[in-house]
């Protein structure tokens, strides 16, 4: 199997860019080259901020405002993973209504605090979240918040047919995941970049369709959403250019973006997911 000698990462945002080259040295990952890019009178210019070092120099670089811009951009990249839904899952954790309410955590452990803040500060957004949840779980009525004297709150809810108060473990795995995904993509304080792994796990087909709409809505608001998925149903709700396939062989890993023109004839009768399952579109198949 061929080994990659160098990995290069480039982040571009309007007139600013950040490039990081990684290489192996004595069994360790080493930063071979690090630089900032900017536009100067219409010409692309770069400045080196680090070479052959173990840690990135961007966080300590104060040489230009663009460095602060890129640092701010990178700091708003968030990754999420809502797979754990057991009796001791992150969704069962208590969270502080102030300290834990600034941004959603990676595994959803502060979901209650985020929802409580949205309810108090953005009631219209909160009501929209409730309606989307009800479109998948019609029995769901509302969340129930009862902060303690220590300003801690836990995720609780009510259904339409009972006065009982339920917890997250009283929801199916797919429903609690869908609730977390709904809050993630409908929150008023969206991060610039959301990275999420297999959000379709355990979701009803109707919920998968709703999820695709939530992803598109967040993207329309300026958030870049990067999703790793194995769901043919999910990608069927997107355009070919929205989908990148990742393939690995003896020459390494390649990433290819699908092309509408190449698939136009097939898409007249089949969905994008159908083409994936039938191995008609390029890539994305186990080898």
What is the predicted function of each stretch?
Residues 124-127, 131-186, 196-209:
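Conserved ABC ATPase signature
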Residues 5, 15-16, 75-76, 239-242, ...:
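Short glycine-/polar-rich loops that comprise or flank the Walker A/P-loop
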Residues 192-193:
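The start of beta-strands in P-loop NTPase/AAA+ ATPase cores
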Residues 210-287:
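C-terminal lobe/lid and adjacent interdomain/linker elements of RecA-like ASCE P-loop ATPase modules
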């Amino acid at each position: 199997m061929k080994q990659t000698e160098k990995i290069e990462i480039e982040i571009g945002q309007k007139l600013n860019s950040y490039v990081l080259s990684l290489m192996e040295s004595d069994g360790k990952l080493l930063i071979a080259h690090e630089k900032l890019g900017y536009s100067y009178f219409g010409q692309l210019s770069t400045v080196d901020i680090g070479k052959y070092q173990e840690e990135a120099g961007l966080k300590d670089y104060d040489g230009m405002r663009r460095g602060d811009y890129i640092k701010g951009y990178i700091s708003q990249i968030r990754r999420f993973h809502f797979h754990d839904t057991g009796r001791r899952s992150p969704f069962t954790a208590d969270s502080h209504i102030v300290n834990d309410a600034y941004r959603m955590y990676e595994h959803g452990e502060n979901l209650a605090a985020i929802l409580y803040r949205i309810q108090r500060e953005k009631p219209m957004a909160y009501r929209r979240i409730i309606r989307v949840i009800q479109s998948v779980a019609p029995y769901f009525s509302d969340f129930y918040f009862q902060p303690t004297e220590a300003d801690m709150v836990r995720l609780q809810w009510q259904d339409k047919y009972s006065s009982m108060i339920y917890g997250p473990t009283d929801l199916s795995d797919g429903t609690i995941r869908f609730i977390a995904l709904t809050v993630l993509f409908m929150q008023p304080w969206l991060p610039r970049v959301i990275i999420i792994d297999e959000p379709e796990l355990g979701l009803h087909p109707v919920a998968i369709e709703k999820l695709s709409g939530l992803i598109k809505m967040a993207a329309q608001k300026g958030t870049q959403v990067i999703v790793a998925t194995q769901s043919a149903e999910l990608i069927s709700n997107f355009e070919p250019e929205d989908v990148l396939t990742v393939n690995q062989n003896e020459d390494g890993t390649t990433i290819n973006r699908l092309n509408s023109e190449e698939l136009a004839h097939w898409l007249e009768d089949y969905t994008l997911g159908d083409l994936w399952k039938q191995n008609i579109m390029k890539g994305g198949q186990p080898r």
